[in-house]
Design a protein with these regions (language model features):
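N-terminal export and membrane-targeting signals
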Residues: 1-29
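Hydrophobic alpha-helical
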Residues: 152-169, 238, 257-324
């Protein structure tokens, strides 16, 4: 295979020499070949025509550019709940985490704790460790504690169907975060509410960012975790949206479970760099952490931190993702979940359940964060929700 040392052409300064890059790329190629027999979970398009060729999608580009401009605004007012029951006192919650190494799961847990302090509730976090057995054990422990409510933190409730059934017998309401694809109540699995943005909106704006940023000419790689239904749905929608632009080609669809991301992502990225060279212009991942794990491979190849490839995370916008975006280190944008706000919403949904009220069903609008609109912040924390929820709860 002939390598295309695009990073040499785009890195300025005399210190970067083609010979040095080629030697680094050759090492990456050998490493990727050696590791090719190890665990892989990708499907890719063939070489095809270059995504930087003359074909584009003018109409789709204009639509994408306008949508991204709206999503980058930071001054939108709070449009979530403003009415509801006053705080029910003396309750306890158990937050069952898919894995606390998932920054989104961990960020929401902190939001739940913050809001629970306001209403005077107790919160216990149980880490499922990212494995089916661990999550089942964590759910079993949560039900055995007989709390007032249990949070399904970032995993498929169907994978713990026995424990979910036991919670139903004990009349323990369940509120999910990214537990199913749609926000609001769910009958199967039985959730009082599921807190999330609309996955269709997140997928669409992530793909539109690539279309707008590339002017409709890109070679993209999609990173996902197909073991999580929410993540799988998101990545499939991203791939579908990218396909609407004829000038964008999905080069590879990489299935890397989040618990394995730290070990697998670097070698998968090394392999992708050797396979696609300068055809790989953009990436999108269902979680920002993939780009933290990809950074060593990009550095080893001599890829510039500011891109290409230009990387966007389609969730969850944890502090490390913002740091990469703000410093131009292997991530250009993120579509962050308002993690703290969603933690507050989870507490509000439980309060509605305890009071006998219906769920609010609120879903936060999508937002795109780049170095140009974060003002150095390390999270997306929209304004107005704390005041609104405190007023609802009488706190």
């Amino acid at each position: 295979m002939t390598l295309r040392p695009w990073s040499v052409r785009r890195l300025a300064g005399p210190a970067v020499r083609p010979g040095r890059f080629v030697r680094r790329a050759a090492v990456l190629l050998v490493t990727a070949v050696v590791l090719a027999g190890c665990e892989r979970g990708s499907s890719s398009g063939g070489p095809g025509e270059s995504a930087t060729g003359p074909s584009g999608c003018p109409a789709d580009y204009d639509t994408a550019r306008a949508a991204v401009a709206r999503a980058e605004r930071t001054d939108a007012p709070w449009r979530g709940p403003i009415t509801g029951p006053r705080a029910v006192p003396g309750r306890s919650l158990v937050y069952v985490a898919q894995t606390m190494t998932n920054p989104g799961v961990a960020g929401v847990a902190q939001g739940v704790k913050e809001a629970a302090r306001v209403v005077g509730w107790n919160v216990r976090v149980i880490d499922g460790g990212g494995t089916p057995a661990g999550i089942q054990a964590a759910m079993g422990q949560a039900v055995a504690l007989k709390p007032a409510g249990i949070v399904i933190g970032g995993f498929d409730p169907n994978s713990t169907s026995q424990q979910v059934s036991r919670a139903g017998v004990e009349h323990i309401p369940l509120v999910g975060w990214h537990a199913v694809a749609a926000p609001g109540p769910s009958r199967r699995p039985p959730l009082f509410s599921n807190v999330t943005t609309h996955v269709q909106d997140v997928a669409r704006i992530s793909a539109q960012w690539i279309i707008a940023h590339s002017r409709g000419r890109a070679g993209a790689v999609v990173f996902t975790d197909a073991s999580i239904p929410f993540a799988r749905t998101k990545s499939e929608l991203i791939r579908k949206e990218l396909a609407t632009c004829r000038g964008v080609r999905v080069l590879a669809y990489e299935n890397i479970p989040i618990p394995d991301a730290s070990s697998r992502t670097p070698r998968e990225v090394a392999s992708l760099l050797s396979r696609f060279g300068d055809r790989w212009t953009h990436s999108v991942a269902i979680n920002d952490l993939y780009f933290a794990d990809a950074a060593p491979a990009f550095r080893a190849a001599g890829a510039p931190g500011a891109g290409p490839p230009y990387n966007i995370g389609a969730g969850d916008g944890d502090p490390s993702a913002f740091q990469r975006v703000n410093s131009g280190q292997y991530q250009s944008a993120t579509v962050p979940e308002p993690l703290t706000q969603q933690g507050w919403q989870i507490v509000d949904e439980f309060n509605r359940a305890f009071a006998g009220d219906p769920a609010s069903g609120y879903a936060a609008p999508v937002h795109v964060s780049t170095a140009d609109n974060t003002d150095g912040a390390t999270s997306w924390d929209p304004t107005g929700y704390r005041e609104a929820y405190r007023k609802i709860w009488g706190r």
